[in-house]
Amino acid sequence: IIGPVLGLVGSALGGLLKKIG
């Protein structure tokens, strides 16, 4: 469970960072 969740969270954070940065 933790693996896939971290992947989704990581991708989400990456998208936000790209939008902000």
Curated annotation (Swiss-Prot):
The modification D-allo-isoleucine is found at residue 2. Its main location: secreted. Keywords: Amidation, Amphibian defense peptide, Antibiotic, Antimicrobial, Cytolysis, D-amino acid, Hemolysis, Secreted. The modification Isoleucine amide is found at residue 20. GO terms for cellular component: extracellular region. Expressed by the skin glands. It is found in: Secreted. GO terms for biological process: defense response to bacterium; killing of cells of another organism. Has antimicrobial and hemolytic activities. Belongs to the bombinin family. This is Bombinin-H5. It comes from Bombina variegata. The lineage of its organism: Eukaryota, Metazoa, Chordata, Craniata, Vertebrata.
